[in-house]
UniProtKB/Swiss-Prot annotation:
Superkingdom, taxonomy of origin: Bacteria
Protein name: Flavodoxin
Pfam families attached to this UniProt entry: Flavodoxin_1
Signal peptide (residue range): none
Cofactors (names): FMN
Length: 148
């Protein structure tokens, strides 16, 4: 049984829904899952004792990449603390009409890769309401479980 942490930042509830759905799918596969809001965690020690950390963040801003407010402190702290060096994968919700569709997901994954994280699955990028893409969310969770 693997120990998985899912950390997310969500303003409208869409990314939170994805975090909860992915967490439920991973737990149903027999793994231990903890889901935390990014505003309630610190980067220091984030990956310690975890087999995998999933990072979920919605993207805001049309002309530049803006991470969801609760996620900014964690994102900025990852490099300073050296956290984020374990196994990871990223997901998020956005709007494909924006210049940088799900740009926060790309920024987080790039930061983690730069810190030496092992990215175990391609990122999941949801356009709009994730509830209409339940099969895609579950398929991604399945790929994550396979990587465990």
């Amino acid at each position: 049984m693997a120990n998985v942490l899912i950390v997310y930042g969500s303003t409208t509830g869409n990314t939170a829904w994805v975090a909860e759905t992915v967490g439920r799918d991973i737990a149903e596969a027999g793994h231990s899952v903890e889901i935390r809001d990014a505003g309630q965690v610190e980067a220091e020690g984030l990956c310690e004792g975890r087999d995998l950390v999933l990072f979920g963040c919605s993207t805001w801003g049309d002309d530049e990449i803006e991470l969801q407010d609760d996620f900014i402190h964690l994102y900025e702290s990852l490099e300073a603390t050296g956290a984020g060096k374990g196994r990871a994968a990223c997901f998020g919700c956005g709007d494909s009409s924006y210049t940088y569709f799900c740009g926060a997901v790309d920024a987080i994954e790039e930061r983690l890769s730069g810190l030496g994280a092992d990215i175990v699955a391609d990122s999941l990028k949801i356009d709009g309401d994730p509830r209409t893409m339940r099969d895609d969310v579950s398929a991604w969770a399945g790929r994550v479980v396979t990587a465990l």
